[in-house]
Curated annotation (Swiss-Prot):
Enzyme class, spelled out: transferase
Region (Disordered): 38-57, 71-322, 1069-1102
UniProt entry tagged with the keyword Cell wall biogenesis/degradation: no
Name of the protein in question: Transcriptional repressor NF-X1
Gene: NFX1
EC number of the protein: 2.3.2.-
Signal peptide span: none
Family recorded in the similarity comment: Belongs to the NFX1 family.
One Pfam short name: zf-NF-X1
Sample GO molecular function, one term: RNA polymerase II transcription regulatory region sequence-specific DNA binding
Subcellular location: Nucleus
Organism: Bos taurus
Length: 1116
């Protein structure tokens, strides 16, 4: 961050002191007599996002606030009376004006006096002809030239930091001056008055003021500025340690964050703010020093830029529509919605924050709980329910998960506490943040090395970074820098590290850095201990292993001459000195096999050894030293007598295993040195390779990971190339091939420039398709890469395939249109017409007509109904046409097949002929023409039964009593069964269901007849097919309309009754079935039997039917 010029006489806050406590409640009235002295430490300890002290009071001008804070550093006893009086009058005047008390009489008097002073100052300005003259006036009053205090040219240019790494630009900046108001690079603000003032119609809003332009009507404020500057400069010389309120550590806004605005400033233009360029953030290594008054992340703004224009302040005081902030804590409430905390406060205060569990708004009086990980706010009851629900349980952990950040908590919250956790069940106050206690937060920064606590009032969201500063040593420990407390970044200076490296000889030449230094990079040449090998290594390698001659071991035999002068060192390359000769007499104490001490052999008469060249005496026992052959269970030993030197070859055999240990074989020990100790068996490995596609199939395999050596070879997504990697599991990678030709769309308007990855589809084009189409209709689809264009959807008129009608609104791409009507074309047989729906092509094709023949039969007149046989005669078949037969009285009706009816007539005719035999035997003639004509065959009738006879008797009885047939005295019409036989059969299976249906239908018919509506419907519940069929059949009897809806198994029936059409039958179906189920009475017994005259015709008696006795046949 670019450093502003240090303020002379600035002081530094002690953050560890007891007074470093943020003010909990700001005094709302600066004009109160008991609270006139402001504590500058409290002003400085406000939060980074709190407004500066110049904003805390109700629109007090910057001049008055500056005066207030200049006097606030004196003790109460040492403050000059003149300053106290000035402070009281200034604060009182401003505070009263800000509260809108201009209408009071005493206030009007003060306004008039002030107006007189303004006119006098205006006259003083009129006397000055130019800017130098005005400058001389200020110089004469203050005794100091204004230009002498301007900073250097290097300090005037403050470069704005570009976050994208662009070259910094020189921006026009406000520079430090002791005058009132900003000064732009060498020009005083008083010189701005000579510029052209914009026209009123071209000016901005009322409160908007262009940067660097002063209106003519603000000259009175300029004059007062010139007069008052001398006194202020003298005050500054007397008290150099005082700081302005906007320089207080806690009162400056943080860079990158917009400070909260007052209500009166929200409608003003930001032109004055735009003139201040951003202060770039420099690296800590490049900054030479840090000002004691700089707070690290707080922008340093000049005093002149902090002071408001008197004219603007006056306009705001006189504007009745500008709302001022209420007094109390709400003035300092965090309102920056760009931060997490500011957004939470804004939403909770306005009751626009929603609970993530119930999706309801969080009210200011509702108990809440805030997650300490993500800082989301929930209703307390909602988070309790969530924590106890199975969905909140953490996998593999004991606890419950936060609905927002999934952070696992061990305990379920049961109490309603404020955000800082100090107060339970906090009461809501209109002047405080909802759900907060109003006290200082004092929470520690988690995970940071910061001893300070949060100095904000109790707030939601994360605590801001610690505003305190601390002195931190750089990594090399040579320089000190002032950094933010708890800042995790390390401090680096621009000096070399100069620490001793790992070699202990050289120093680190890198710049100040963190962590251990890199190993020494100097290359040295080292020699092994035996001097036969050398190597080049980095300095510091194998430190402490040097023996003065060599630095490492080369793993070769040493070979140096021993002290005995007869033997050489047989050890591996080692540091000096070599071990003494192992054959010296004082070192050899046992025989060569090691079983017998030499002292015993000397006692037995063996000669003693004097030099290393003398042989070692043998004990004469078996050597017994272990040999390298054999197995773990049985170790072979040397079978020779005690001897010097190596043992000879073993004369035994050893068992060795193959590589995979699947098979073994036996070999002589003498051949183990010439042959390999292992062999390969012929077993093939059947395990799958890592690719999962192939088997290993290796002979005597010993691999743990069976890698597949084959190439994958599968086609890639591009469809052009194959995978060239070793065979693997899963999907292949994308094709790495690329084309260096341009890939264009079909029309060439859109282009993808090379390199083009293989498999890339042509680019999408927004141009209209330019291909040649089959039709001449307008084209509405875009350019495409498919070979075939999408179908044309232009609506046209087309004939159907059978040329029956001209169809409209048919899309152009549809070719074969069917109208849905029967074809009706005459078939090749000439007798039938095509019954297919409107179709394409020929009606029959290779097939023949199979429709039934319509030629009438000769015997019955019904159609032939045989498959179409063209010109061939009709085949002789039985007629299967259905006809209706009736009895003589017409009561009985039955539908029968024509062939069955003719056979019945023949049976009746045979019976009639048998009854005429007697007449033929007597010589009488018999009329048989009626029995064999076709007319009689068509007039075949059924036989009357007992009911027909009963009905006939009732008719005669009615005629005898002269009863009219219209009255239906015997209920003949209603007794005629309206229920079909199939309905009766179905109803017998479930009489209770039929009874319930009849009751519903009767109630429906009565309701529609009595009600106002002409139609009324009833919906039956879903039922099976048999029950639905019963309802349909009964609906016909009752005159109801029945329709089935839905699909199985939810298919049901809805019946509708229509007034005048629906009627209840006189006899219900259940009544008819109950009557039929009753036992029938036996027929009447005949008193005499009629016999024929010829008793000899026994066959005729068997054929003839017994006559029915008619008791009502009365002869007149």
């Amino acid at each position: 961050m670019a450093e502003a010029p240090p303020v002379s006489g600035a002081f530094k806050f002690n953050t560890d002191a007891a007074e470093f406590i943020p003010q909990e409640r700001k005094n709302s009235g600066l004009y109160c007599g008991s609270q006139r002295r402001l504590d500058s430490n409290r002003i400085g300890r406000r939060n980074y996002s709190s407004p500066p002290p110049c904003h805390l009071s109700r629109q007090i001008s910057y001049d008055d606030i500056s005066a207030v804070h200049q006097h606030s550093f004196y003790p109460s006893g040492s403050k000059p009376k003149s300053q106290q009086t000035s402070f009281q009058s200034s604060v009182t005047n401003k505070s009263l004006k800000n509260h809108g008390l201009q209408n009071q009489p005493w206030q009007k008097l003060r306004s008039e006096k002030q107006h007189i002073r303004v006119k006098r100052a205006q006259g003083l300005i009129d006397q000055t002809s130019d800017a130098p003259g005005l400058e001389n006036v200020a110089k004469s009053e203050s005794g100091t030239n204004l230009r002498e205090h301007s900073p250097s040219e290097s300090e005037k240019e403050i470069v704005g930091a570009d976050p994208r790494g662009a070259k910094p630009k020189k921006a026009t900046q406000f520079i430090y001056s002791y005058g009132r108001g900003p000064k732009v690079k060498g020009k005083l603000k008083s010189e701005w008055g000579h510029r052209m003032t914009p026209k009123p119609e071209e000016a901005g809003p009322e409160n908007t003021k262009p940067a660097g332009v002063i209106h003519p009507d603000s000259s009175d404020a300029s004059s007062r500025k010139v007069v008052a500057d001398g006194a202020r400069r003298g005050e500054q010389r007397r008290h150099p340690q005082k700081r302005s309120p906007w320089e207080v550590e806690g009162a400056r806004p943080r860079p990158g964050r917009n400070p909260p605005k007052q209500e009166g400033q929200r409608h003003t233009n930001a032109g004055s703010r735009d003139n201040m360029a951003s202060i770039p953030k420099d690296d800590l290594n490049e900054r030479p020093a840090k000002s004691t008054c700089d707070s690290g992340n707080l922008a340093v703004v000049s005093r002149s830029s902090r002071r408001a224009d008197p004219e603007k302040c006056a306009v705001r005081r006189q504007d009745p529509q500008v709302a001022s902030f209420p007094r109390g804590k709400q003035n300092h409430m965090l309102k920056n919605v760009e931060t997490h905390t500011g957004s939470l406060i804004e939403q909770l205060t306005t009751e626009k924050y929603e609970c993530m569990v119930c999706c309801e708004l969080v009210r200011v009086t509702a108990p809440v709980w805030s997650c300490q990980s993500c800082y989301h706010v929930f209703h307390l009851n909602c988070i309790k329910k969530w924590a106890r629900s199975p969905a909140s349980q953490a996998d593999g952990q004991s606890g419950w998960r936060c609905p927002a950040c999934q952070n696992v908590s061990a305990h379920v919250p049961n109490t309603y506490t404020c955000f800082c956790g100090k107060v339970k069940n906090p009461e809501w106050s209109r002047n405080e943040i909802p759900h907060s206690c109003g006290e200082v937060c004092r929470r520690k920064q988690p995970g940071q090395d910061c001893p300070h606590s949060c100095n904000l009032l109790c707030h939601p969201g994360p605590c801001p970074p610690c505003p305190a500063f601390m002195t931190k040593t750089c990594e090399c420990g040579r320089t000190r820098h002032t950094v933010r407390c708890g800042q995790a970044v390390s401090v680096h200076c621009s000096n070399p590290c100069d620490n001793i490296l790992n070699c202990g000889q050289h120093h680190c030449a890198e710049l100040c850095h963190g962590g251990p230094c890199q190993p020494c990079r100097v290359i040295l040449n080292q020699v092994c201990y035996c001097g036969s090998t050398s190597r080049d290594v980095l300095c510091g390698t194998d430190i402490g292993k040097s023996d003065g001659f060599g630095d490492f071991g080369c793993l070769k035999i040493c070979g140096k001459d021993l002290k005995c002068g007869n033997h050489t060192c047989s050890q591996v390359c080692h540091p000096q000195p070599c071990q003494p000769c192992p054959r010296l007499p004082q070192l050899v104490r046992y025989c060569p096999c090691g079983q017998t001490p030499l002292s015993q052999l000397l006692e037995l008469g063996s000669s003693g050894r004097k030099t290393c060249m003398d042989p070692v005496p043998s004990c004469g026992k078996v050597c017994g030293k272990p040999l390298p052959c054999g197995s773990l269970d049985f170790i072979h030993t040397c079978e020779k007598l005690c001897h010097e030197g190596d043992c000879g070859p073993c004369s035994r055999t050893s068992v060795i295993s193959c590589r995979c240990s699947f098979r073994t074989k036996e070999l002589p020990c003498t051949s183990l040195k010439s042959e390999d100790a292992t062999f390969m068996c012929d077993k093939r490995c059947n395990k799958k390779r890592l690719c999962g596609r192939h088997k290993c199939n290796e002979i005597c395999c010993v691999d743990k990971e069976h890698k597949c050596p084959l190439i994958c070879g599968r086609k890639l997504r591009c469809g052009l190339h194959r995978c060239e990697e070793p065979c693997h599991r899963g999907n292949c990678q994308t094709c790495w091939q690329a084309s260096f030709d341009e890939l264009t769309c079909h029309c060439g308007a859109s282009v993808i420039y090379p390199p083009v990855p293989c498999g890339t589809r042509p680019p999408e084009c927004t141009q209209t398709c330019a291909r040649v189409h089959e039709c001449d209709h307008p084209v509405y689809h875009s350019c495409h890469s498919e070979d075939k264009c999408p179908p044309c959807t232009f609506l046209t008129q087309k004939w159907c395939m059978g040329k029956h009608e001209l169809r409209s609104n048919i899309p152009c791409h549809l070719v074969d249109i069917s109208c849905g009507l029967p074809c009706g074309a005459t078939l090749p047989c000439g007798m039938h017409k095509c019954q297919r729906l409107c179709h394409k092509g020929e009606c029959l094709g290779d097939e023949i007509c199979k429709q039934p023949c319509t030629t009438s039969r000769a015997n019955c007149g019904h159609p032939c109904m045989a498959p179409c046989h063209l010109s061939l005669p009709c085949p002789v078949t039985t007629c299967k046409a259905k006809i209706e037969l009736q009895c003589e009285c017409g009561r009985r009706k039955e539908i029968m097949v024509c062939s069955e009816a003719s056979s019945t007539y023949q049976r009746i005719a045979a019976i009639s002929m048998a009854s005429k035999i007697t007449d033929m035997q007597l010589g009488d003639s018999v009329e048989i023409s009626k029995l064999i004509t076709k007319k009689e065959i068509h007039q075949a009738r059924l036989e009357c039964d007992e009911e027909c006879s009963a009905l006939e008797r009732k008719k005669r009885l009615a005629e005898a009593f002269h009863i009219s047939d219209d009255s239906d005295p015997f209920n003949v019409r209603s007794s005629g069964s309206k229920f079909s036989d199939s309905l009766k059969e179905d109803a017998r299976k479930d009489l209770r269901f039929v009874s319930d249906i009849e009751k519903e239908m009767e109630a429906l018919v009565e309701a529609v007849n009595k009600g106002k509506s002409s139609k009324k419907s009833h919906c039956f519940p879903p039922m099976n097919r048999d029950h639905r069929r019963i309802i349909h059949d009964l609906a016909q009897v009752y005159g109801l309309e029945s329709v089935s809806y839905d699909s199985e198994p939810k298919r049901n029936v809805v019946v509708t009754a229509v007034r005048g059409k629906s009627i209840c039958p006189s006899t219900t179906l259940t009544g008819v079935l109950e009557k039929e189920n009753q036992s029938r009475p036996p027929p009447p017994i005949a008193h005499h039997r009629q016999t024929d005259k010829n008793p000899g015709s026994s066959n005729l008696q068997k054929i003839a039917k017994e006559p029915v006795i008619d008791y009502f046949d009365v002869q007149d």
